[in-house]
Amino acid sequence: MTDYLTSGEGASKPGYLVLLRHGQTAWSVSGQYTGRTDVPLNEEGRRQALEGGKRLRGAFPDGFGRGHIFSSPLRRARETAQLAGYSDFETLDDLMEWDYGPAEGRRREEVGAVLGHDWCVWDEGPEVLPARMQGDWVCTLPDSGKVDVHSGAGETVDEAAARARRVIGKVTPLMLAGHNVLLVAHAHILRIVTTQWLRADPHSGRFLRLDTAHHSVLGYYKDDPVIIHWNI
C-alpha cells in the first residue's frame, strides 16, 4: 500500500475507497445505453477483468478484508469481481448503473432521432424522453445470447446521486476505521459516487473518464475527501 499513502504533514490515516469498473460488454462496444439490462461480459471483457485484477492486486497487495468488498448485483459487475479475484463480495442495489429509462438498449443517435436534437444523459436525463419509447423486448447479442430489456421511466441524476450518497454513508465508517473498501460497479454510477465523495454537483461526473476494468482510488487529505488516483 505504500504507493498510495499520502505524505507530509496532514497525511491521512483512514482507508481508501477503490472503484473498479466492470469489463467490456457487447453493448459497451456498440454504444448502447446499458443501465439495468443484465448484459454479461464478452470475451474481451473477461480478459480485461483478469488484467484489471492483476493491476489492483499490485496496488493493494494486502487485498480487502471480509465485509469490505461491494458489487452491483448486475452480472457484468459480479463477473468482473470474481475474475479479478474478489469473489467474497456483498451486493448493493445502490451500486446498480444509472437507470436510463427509455434510452435503455438504444444508441445516443437513436435517442436524438426521436427527440429531433442531440441528447446527452448528463444534460437532460431520461426524464425528457417520451413514454412511447418505453417497453420490454428481447435483444440478441453478437454471440447469439439473449437479454431481456426493460425500458421504463428511468431516474434523474439527482436520484442516482442519492443512491451514491447512501453507498458513501455505508462505506465511510469502514474507511474511518482504517479499512480499504472496494466497489465494483459501472461507469456512470461510479463517476457519480466520485462527485458525491467530493461534495460536488453530480453533473460534473461527465468530466471523469473511467475505462472498462480500470480502477480509481478515493481518500482523504488533510481531512478533505479527494481523488488519490484515477483510471488506472
PLM regions and their residue ranges:
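Short hydrophobic/aromatic-enriched beta-strand-loop microsegments
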Residues: 40, 87-94, 201-210
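Short glycine/proline- and acidic residue-enriched helix-loop micro-motifs
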Residues: 116-159
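Acidic, low-complexity terminal tails and accessory targeting/binding regions
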Residues: 1-16, 52, 98-110, 173, ...
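Glycine-rich phosphate-binding loop signature in dinucleotide/nucleotide-binding domains
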Residues: 59-65, 171-180
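Phosphate-coordination/substrate-recognition cap region in phosphate-metabolizing enzymes
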Residues: 3-12, 51-120, 124-131
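Loop-to-helix element that buttresses phosphate recognition and phosphoryl-transfer chemistry
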Residues: 18-83, 150-165
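Beta-strand elements within well-structured catalytic alpha/beta cores of enzymes
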Residues: 15-21, 70, 179-189
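Active-site signature of alpha/beta-hydrolase-fold catalytic machinery across serine-
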Residues: 83, 192, 196
